[in-house]
Structures are given as structure tokens and as C-alpha cells.
């Protein structure tokens, strides 16, 4: 019997078919397993807090972020303060930021930090942080206006700026993020009541929808307060296991492993997912603008 060898010209075609099938299957699996709809025209971003340790857990969270990006192509990461612990020399910026997030940085994902109490003021001049020399600043993506604040030094000048910037914003969504949480039920730090008294009335007056903070090394979603949805996500590097003290304010919490958040905003909906260092979904839901999480 005479057997002919396969036509080599078919190999590229077969390879394309196999890769396309794998991509479709992977996308289908993501759609089935993820609470995020992954719509083509939505705003997608990640949130990390208290991440800059340079230790193995930080790198493992970063690896989960990279895996997520392959299916959920976010192009923004908001950083909730304590972006770097300990010494903050050039070598530390390499080990505690550039190396763990290299796969994301290399494809153009933009990191936008807020300062925490462990961060040196000089961080505002570090080019990959995109702060442009400002302790607090605002920027817009799609129909969302972000406000990155410096809660460590909340002086009168910043408070006046917050009110002016919120008043002038015209986007549908207003999201504020900063380090010290206005609401937290973690034992170590808890709620920053003085800060809440100072800035929450401004948030309410001008219709802030969502607030992200860190500082407590846990994940917590707070029941909506005065129409605002609050998240604490301070465990992307540091962790305090067993530190949560749940109360009636706590909608969901997780303190058994490091974690980060993935967020998608589409129209009047904000979908969110809290993901552990091992890739486990520890909380998820959707917020309707001017409504409550469900």
C-alpha cells in the first residue's frame, strides 16, 4: 500500500484552526465561569491595595492579574496606596513594581496610584505611576471620572479641590479612591471617622457612586452608605488573616488570602469580582448606578 505524506501547505491552516478553536473555547469558559460580562465596549480595570512588598505573595497576585488579562483585557490598574513598603530606592521600584507587573506594563496597561501612609512623597515623580507630580488628581475613561486622593495629608487645599473637581465633572460615573477607608470593620485600623466627617458630605452632595480604599489588609464590601458603595481592597501584597470583625455594615469579606479586584463598567452597571491569590472568586456582584449592589 502506498501512503502519501500530508501536504505541508496544510500545516499553517490546521494550526490556525486549532489556535482559533482553543481561543473560542477559552473565551467560552471565561464567559461561563466569570461574573464579568466582558463586553467589547465596556471600561475594564483592576484595583490593588497595599501591594508593594516585593515578596512572593505580591508576585503571585500579579500572576493572577496577568492570567485574568488574557481573557479580560483591562487597560487600567488603580492602586489604593502603600504602593511600596520599606526602602524606596531605584532597585526597590524594580523589585516591588516593575518586575511583578512587567507582563502588564509591557502591553501598555496603565497604573494610576493614590498615595498611602508608607509611600514617600517622591513617588509622584515616578514616571510609570503616571501621577505627573500631583498628590491628588483626576482623569476620565469612557463615561467614568476617577479621583485619586491623598488621604494621608487631607488639607484644606485638597478638600477645596475635591469639591471643585466633583462639581465640574460631567461623566455618568464618579469613582473616588484613596488609602484610608471611610468604612472598615477590620480590627487593625477600622473606619477613618475623622476623614469620613470631612469628605463624605462632599461625596454625597456631588453624587459619588463608588469609593475604593486599602490600608486594612483584607477585602471587604460595605453595605451602601448614603447611596455610595464602598470597597476595602488592601490585600494585594500584605495580609492580616482573621482580622475581619464583621458587622451589619459588612456585605461581604475575605481575610484568608491575598486578593485583588476586577471591575467592569457598562452603561448603568458596574460589575465587580474579588479574586484571591489562587484565582478563587471570593465576592462578586453588580452595582446599578444610583442603586445598590446585588
Q: Where on the chain are the PLM-derived regions?
A:
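Generic beta-sheet signal
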Residues: 75-77, 172-178
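A mature extracytoplasmic/lumenal domain signature
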Residues: 49-52, 153, 234, 276
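N-terminal active-site segment of His-dependent metallophosphoesterases
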Residues: 27-92, 157, 185
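N-terminal secretory signal peptides that target proteins for export/translocation
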Residues: 1-8
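A short C-terminal boundary segment appended to hydrolase-like catalytic domains
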Residues: 39, 253-294
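Active-site glycine-centered loops adjacent to acidic/histidine catalytic or metal-binding residues
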Residues: 50, 81-82, 116-117, 179, ...
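Extended active-site neighborhood of metal-dependent phosphoesterases/phosphodiesterases
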Residues: 37-39, 44, 66, 85-174, ...
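Bacterial N-terminal signal peptides
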Residues: 13-25
Amino acid at each position: 500500500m502506498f501512503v502519501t505524506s500530508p501536504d505541508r501547505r496544510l500545516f499553517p491552516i490546521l494550526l490556525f484552526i486549532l489556535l482559533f478553536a482553543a481561543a473560542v473555547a477559552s473565551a467560552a469558559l471565561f464567559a461561563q465561569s466569570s461574573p464579568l460580562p466582558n463586553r467589547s465596549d465596556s471600561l475594564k480595570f483592576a484595583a490593588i491595595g497595599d501591594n508593594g512588598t516585593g515578596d512572593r505573595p505580591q508576585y503571585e497576585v500579579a500572576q493572577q492579574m496577568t492570567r485574568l488579562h488574557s481573557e479580560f483585557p483591562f487597560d487600567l490598574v488603580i492602586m489604593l496606596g502603600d504602593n511600596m513598603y520599606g526602602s524606596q530606592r531605584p532597585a526597590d521600584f524594580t523589585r516591588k513594581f516593575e518586575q511583578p507587573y512587567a507582563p502588564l506594563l509591557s502591553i501598555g496597561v496603565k497604573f494610576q496610584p493614590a498615595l498611602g501612609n508608607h509611600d514617600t512623597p517622591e513617588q509622584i515623580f515616578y514616571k510609570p505611576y503616571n501621577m505627573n507630580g500631583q498628590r491628588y488628581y483626576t482623569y476620565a475613561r469612557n463615561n467614568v471620572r476617577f479621583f485619586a486622593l491623598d488621604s494621608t495629608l487631607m488639607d484644606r487645599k485638597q478638600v477645596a479641590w475635591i469639591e471643585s473637581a466633583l462639581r465640574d465633572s460631567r461623566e455618568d460615573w464618579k469613582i473616588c479612591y484613596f488609602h484610608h477607608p471611610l468604612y472598615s470593620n477590620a480590627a487593625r485600623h477600622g473606619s477613618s471617622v475623622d476623614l469620613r466627617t470631612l469628605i463624605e458630605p462632599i461625596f454625597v452632595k456631588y453624587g459619588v457612586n463608588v469609593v475604593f480604599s486599602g490600608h486594612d489588609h483584607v477585602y471587604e464590601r460595605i453595605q451602601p452608605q448614603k447611596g455610595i458603595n464602598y470597597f476595602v481592597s488592601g490585600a494585594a501584597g500584605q495580609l492580616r488573616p482573621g482580622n475581619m470583625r464583621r458587622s451589619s455594615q459588612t456585605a461581604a469579606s475575605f481575610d484568608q488570602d491575598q486578593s485583588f479586584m476586577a471591575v467592569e463598567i457598562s452603561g448603568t452597571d458596574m460589575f465587580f469580582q474579588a479574586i484571591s491569590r489562587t484565582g478563587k472568586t471570593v465576592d462578586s456582584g453588580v452595582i446599578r448606578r444610583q442603586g445598590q449592589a446585588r
